[in-house]
Amino acid sequence: MKKVLAFVLALVMVLSMAACGNDANKQGDAEKEVTKIRLAHDYSPETANSIGMENFAKLVAEKSGGTIEIDIYSNGELSGRNSQTTFKLLQSGDIDMAIVPPPNTDAWQLFYQPFFFRDSDSAYAACQGEAGQMMLDKLRDSNNVVGLAYLPIAMRAFTNSKHPIQAPADMEGLSFRVLDVPTLVAWMKEFKASAVPMSMAELYMSLQNGTVDGQENPLDTIKNQAFYEVQEYLSITNHIWSFSLFAVNADFWDKLTTEQQDILKECAVEASKDIKELAPEVNDAAYDFLVNEKGMKVNTLTDEQWLEFQKAAKPVWKAMEATIGADVLKPWMDAVGVTWD
């Protein structure tokens, strides 16, 4: 009888310990609950932005101890490679994070001002200061997204089928496809050129059949879209700094813990730095391809020529000042060291 009682007591103890162990395992599982984040972008795998996002996902997993998992939807998988669609998906919360273009709204017209930024480095540096943070704050106010970082792409260049662009007068009478942005349309008018807003999907055919004489984009876009097949002249004008925004849906952001937010912010800044290092390599490779492999006729503006363009563009800045807001334009002029003179 004593042996039976001892056996029963031992069995009870074993079962109790097993139950405690199961409770501990459940508690451990709860502590390691994974937050999944859907991140979308429209860039192909070989681009700096795409590589940067892969590095971002790895860094987040490492710093969160595997408790934050980034699922990447690249190459326009969710948007049909339409950046405006990506932005709308982010605003609505159908995706959690994304690389998106700057909004085509009043204050953000600043970044479409021609010949405002001299180069990528000075533009990126200004974005890391108070002026850059001011714009990220405005992003949430009007778009329901939280801006985490600026992702540099490159300065933009012109192509056309007529002649090199070396002075403002060289643009007179030419028609250029531009983004449907008020500042760009005003600029073309000021330089006596024709602005023809159209989608990227329409552009190649329009260049081929002469609907427009030229277009402007970063060199990597010119390469990837094969515009060299239908354009003879490449002018390195460095007239506008192209960049993207790394952003997160505001409602989703507010549900995260402070620790999770800090991890994502930190990793976003690191991704931005990675992309800044990669972007010049991509740009240089595109230049080599377009000029040395495909034989486009290239000219690069000298400092003197660039300043001539900047002087001619300042009436556009002044015309857009009321739209952008003097409270936005002035801090940015100070940040990049430009004046009205």
Question: Residues of each region from the PLM?
Answer:
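N-terminal secretory/targeting leader peptides
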Residues: 21-120, 140-141, 146-341
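Positively charged n-region of N-terminal signal peptides that target proteins for export
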Residues: 1-9
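Hinge/lid segment of periplasmic solute-binding proteins
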Residues: 125-144, 150
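C-terminal motif of bacterial Sec signal peptides marking the signal peptidase cleavage site
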Residues: 16-19
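Enrichment for repetitive, rod-forming helical segments
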Residues: 9-10, 268
